Amino acid sequence: XVRDAYIADDKNCVYTCASN
């Protein structure tokens, strides 16, 4: 998913991980 794509990015992971 799309979420996986964001997780790949450390910067975006902060938002994605927090949301997830």
From Swiss-Prot:
GO CC term, one of those recorded: extracellular region
Domain of life: Eukaryota
Record keyword RNA-binding present: no
Record keywords: Amidation, Disulfide bond, Ion channel impairing toxin, Neurotoxin, Secreted, Toxin, Voltage-gated sodium channel impairing toxin
Record keyword Secreted present: yes
Major localisation: secreted
Motif (Important for toxin selectivity for individual Nav channel subtype (Nav1.6/SCN8A and Nav1.7/SCN9A), but not for toxin potency): 9-11
Places the protein is found: Secreted
Record domain LCN-type CS-alpha/beta: where: 3-20
InterPro entries: LCN-type_CS_alpha_beta_dom, Scorpion_toxinL/defensin
Entry comment describing in which tissues the protein is expressed: Expressed by the venom gland.
Record-marked site positions (Important for toxin potency but not for selectivity for individual Nav channel subtype (Nav1.6/SCN8A and Nav1.7/SCN9A)): 6
Gene Ontology MF annotations: sodium channel inhibitor activity; toxin activity
Coiled-coil region list: none
Any one Pfam family match given in the protein's UniProt record, by short name: Toxin_3
The protein's role, per its UniProt record: Alpha toxins bind voltage-independently at site-3 of sodium channels and inhibit the inactivation of the activated channels. The fraction to which this protein belongs exhibits low toxicity and induces transient paralysis in all insects tested (the crickets A.domesticus).
Domain notes: Has the structural arrangement of an alpha-helix connected to antiparallel beta-sheets by disulfide bonds (CS-alpha/beta).
The family this protein is said to belong to: Belongs to the long (4 C-C) scorpion toxin superfamily. Sodium channel inhibitor family. Alpha subfamily.
UniProt protein name: Toxin Bl-3
Organism the protein comes from: Buthacus leptochelys
Taxonomic placement: Eukaryota, Metazoa, Ecdysozoa, Arthropoda, Chelicerata
